[in-house]
Amino acid sequence: MYIHLGDDFVVSTRDIVGIFDFKANMSPIVEEFLKKQKHKVVPSVNGTPKSIVVTVQNIYYSPLSSSTLKKRAQFMFEIDS
């Protein structure tokens, strides 16, 4: 199944490694990780990012909240089961 991240981005739920709140996860470790992986970051086009979605191939800055994305992922998982 696929999940819509906002900004016209859709990813496979199988490729998602984690969904994180943008503001809550700006620890030094996360900042270092994002700097090292900056070539994989896909920035949010519409407004301020509210969440970070880490996938196998890319890191997306999403304008949708992490709780909204979590609900979408759970819904897709329930449909898939």
From Swiss-Prot:
Source species: Bacillus subtilis (strain 168)
InterPro entries per the UniProt record, alphabetical: RemA-like (IPR007169)
Effect of a null allele: Mutation impairs pellicle formation, complex colony architecture and motility inhibition in a sinR mutant background.
Name of protein: Extracellular matrix regulatory protein B
Entries under NCBIfam families matching the protein: MtxRegRemB
Pfam families cross-referenced by the UniProt entry: RemA-like
Coiled-coil features, chain-numbered ranges: none
Domain of life: Bacteria
Function, in words: Regulates the biosynthesis of the extracellular matrix and the biofilm formation. May act as an enhancer of biofilm gene expression. Acts in parallel to the pathway that governs SinR derepression.
